């Protein structure tokens, strides 16, 4: 006797709180584009009707990091631009994710010199790397789907100021209960 037989036509679904929260996070992401080169053009092509990235929860690009939870770094990052990238990342609220789009963002690309950062993972933690020079919009969509799978495995407590919330903290009064 399965759950469907017990519940009848009531439409009962059993899940976990983390499952619901992570499902919501994958369906309503607020990306901020940090486009610096030709990869940004492919990113814009991905927003066109041919690819319609809004199907994957990427409806609107945000200009402010305070309204974004996903940073897409598309293109090469110079050493002078690195502090700006870090400052924008630090201004994003938790939970936040980073996608390195293209070979320049992932590993410096063909620019192996003193002025170009050899991968943005030297500056910010990267969740998904999208390969290509420049990567096609299909590759970016695949990277977003990989990020969705990573988000679905997340724990809610992993995103509290970057540290898990412990029961002891709540008992000591470090965390105030709601209500």
UniProtKB/Swiss-Prot annotation:
Cofactors (names): [4Fe-4S] cluster
UniProt entry tagged with the keyword Cell membrane: yes
MF GO annotations: 4 iron, 4 sulfur cluster binding; iron ion binding; NADH dehydrogenase (ubiquinone) activity; NADH:ubiquinone reductase (non-electrogenic) activity; quinone binding
Main subcellular location: membrane
Cellular localization per UniProt: Cell membrane
Root EC class: translocase
Keyword GTP-binding appears in the UniProt entry: no
Cofactor remark: Binds 1 [4Fe-4S] cluster.
Family stated for the protein in its record: Belongs to the complex I 20 kDa subunit family.
HAMAP family from the UniProt entry: NDH1_NuoB
Name of the protein described by the UniProt record: NADH-quinone oxidoreductase subunit B 1
